[in-house]
Amino acid sequence: MMKRFYYLFVFLSFILFSSQKVYGQASFFDAHVSKYGELEQVLGDKWDKIDSLVVHGPINEDDFKIMWKCSFEGKLTVLNLEDTQIEGRKIPDCALFNYEKQDATISVHLNIRKIILPDNLEEIGKYAFMKMKLEEINFPQNLRKIGRAAFGNCHWFKTNPVIPEGVTELPARCFMNCQCFDKVTLPTSLKIISDDCFYNTRVAEVNFPEGLDSIGNGAFYASDLKIADLPNSITKIASLTFSMCDRLRYIHIPENGYIDYIPNYFAAYDDSLERVDIPNTIKKVGTCAFDSNHMLKDIKLPNGLTYIGQNAFYKCAFDSIVFPVSLEYLGGGSGAYWKHIKKIYSLAPTPPYCAEDLINRGKGPFHGLTPNNIPVYVPIGSGEKYREAFGWNYFTNIIETDKFPTGIVSPKMSNNELCKVYGKGNELVIEIPNLLSSPIHYSIYSIEGTMIEQGNLIKSYTLRMSAKGVYIVRVGNTTHKIFM
């Protein structure tokens, strides 16, 4: 009997000792403060033993510094601010980030994993939660502004952000290097996605709301984005926006009249990119804009395009391509390593200028695995010009034709021109200096190949055009490309 009581005494003593040890650690603390800057006093000597902290009452920047200390030098991992009144309704700049202590070493991340913010919060300051082991946080509905790099380098951030209505800008590096969320919901109020906002994130799905105005440099660089369907409201796109996106399959740039330039490195090194919608307003494709997109098999270059930059389509998988009549400049390497190309069409009667490759000196736009014996179709009367022009002389099978995929018929050329054709304001002028003894046939086409007018002339003629653009005018056996 005494032996049984002995074992019972030992067991109860162990339970009592263990309970005192657990509760003695003060792993949870409910802090009530009555004024700004009081948190340190309320926590007392327990500050470095607290794992979960709930704060009630008014807090300010000084109180956030204490919370940072509780985590960086203590054990704090969970922070509940739901019942606080934050000064100015703003999380202060660098609220839970200390540049000197955390940025000196790349591996130093604050141990806070969960934060609950109050409903009346209106602003999160710059660098507020940067470089933290944060996994979960709420975005209050009253939130209107988020500061630069507020969540930058929060690698473990797994909450799929739902940005509240009223937020108009996502600032530079806002979610840079966040590695664990895969979907972002953007509000209709959003106007700007700034530089490097989702740089090197695992975000795969983003809605681009109507009303969005601009997307900054590298905004989705090296992300897991699958589709970039840009809204009609977009007026600005930037360099590196969609580069290094291994899972990106489709980019839609709207036909809205605002965007006339595809920036440098816009969507380069995208291993899965299969389709890009380029609007007819585009006049220039920048350096390396679509460089090394090995799955991009087809692209429709817009009528009116004048410039293609260095390496713009380097190593793409085109089987054919049509260079529009408006094209004037082909950058070095822009058609290099097209190992799948079967035919090329160039609609310009004058060969577009071919620049030297800045990396492979002495070579032009076409080289490497681009076969030089494929048919290159050019307008009738321009074959010899192409054969003699640098860059185009890479090809050995240049063929004159008046049949092009766009439907434009390119008639025969002649050096014995009887007239002068030009644009003047919104008028197209066919000037015949001397009255002709017999009528001469003329025809006017849009750049898409649509017949606008035809007839016979013996004297000068002026036609008022309904829209600006590029027109093909045939008078007798001569062809003119006119920019209105």
Residue spans of the language-model regions?
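Bacterial Sec-dependent N-terminal signal peptides
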Residues: 1-27
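Low-complexity, Pro/Thr/Ser/Gly/Ala-rich linker/spacer regions in secreted
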Residues: 22-28, 399-415
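The feature captures the LRR N-terminal capping module
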Residues: 23-45
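Structural signature of tandem-repeat unit edges
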Residues: 26-34, 51-59, 75-89, 102-123, ...
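Short, T/G/N/S-enriched strand-turn elements that build extracellular solenoid repeat scaffolds
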Residues: 37-46, 62-71, 90-95, 127, ...
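Consensus positions within tandem repeat domains that build extended binding/scaffold surfaces
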Residues: 95, 125-128, 147-152, 171-174, ...
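Membrane-proximal C-terminal cap and juxtamembrane stalk of leucine-rich repeat ectodomains
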Residues: 366-407
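C-terminal outer-membrane/trafficking sorting elements
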Residues: 409-484
